Structure formats: structure tokens, C-alpha cells
């Protein structure tokens, strides 16, 4: 019998930057997805707090026992179609995977996106992150043939969209 992992989700704080950058980069390295054209090399990864001070943006941090174990955000990426936002920077340390925390973070992002008035959510990912891709499929994301918007992340070659 699997025991439920006790966790909390809150909004990002400035002091979270260093740990979140570590998580993003270590997860990408773990899955051999630390390649050019991804957030691994994106300078905004080092200051997510400032990035998410943008209008209609939010980033949520997951904690277990007051330790940051991951996060996910909603962002109004430039050049996306009207009413569309992007699910961004969903990364979890290994001990948080398979616990429902990733799903809870995404659902929190769905809620925020709807509150901001978005009607669709887009994401970009890579085949190396296949477990996450499976979660996106289960949550109703559908595959696209081409990218949307202008994220600058040319290293991502899976694009998905969901109606909110």
C-alpha cells in the first residue's frame, strides 16, 4: 500500500531562486536533456521570481517538510494565440515523482490560468521527459504538429495544447 506524501504548494518567493535553478538543471541533466535551446541554458532560470512578476504569470513551488522539491508555472509567452498561456518549468526532484505532486502543480496552474482569463494552455517538452509527457496526455493535452509562440526553446520538439 502506497502512503500519501504530505506536501504543500505555495507561490514563488525571491529566496527560492537558487534551489529552483538547481532543480531545473539537475532534472534536465538527469534525463540527458541538458542541451542548447532548453531552459538549462536560459538565463531566466536563475531568477524565476523576477520572471514571474509579469502580468498574468504565476509560479508555484512544491515543498515536503519545508524543502523545495519542485515547481511549475503559467506564463503569457510572446506570440501565443489570443487566450493562450504556456505551462512552463515543471520540474520535480526524483523523490517527488509518482506522488501526485506534479499533477497537483499542473492543476494549480490550470486554476491560475483560468483566473487570468486564459482559455487554452500550451506546453513544449522533449521525448527525454517521457514520464511527464504521459502525465500531460492523461490531463488532456493533445499533440500539435508545430510549435506556437516564441519561447526561444528550439531544443523542445514536442508541442501540446489543452482547452481549459
Predicted regions and their residues:
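Glycine-centered loop/turn positions within well-structured domains
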Residues: 18, 99, 158
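Acetyl-CoA-dependent GNAT
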Residues: 7, 11-95, 106-108, 112, ...
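Conserved glycine-rich acetyl-CoA-binding loop
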Residues: 67, 80-81, 93-107, 114-116, ...
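Basic/polar N-terminal segments that are highly enriched at the extreme N-terminus
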Residues: 1-6
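C-terminal "cap" of GNAT-fold acetyltransferases
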Residues: 119-122, 126-164
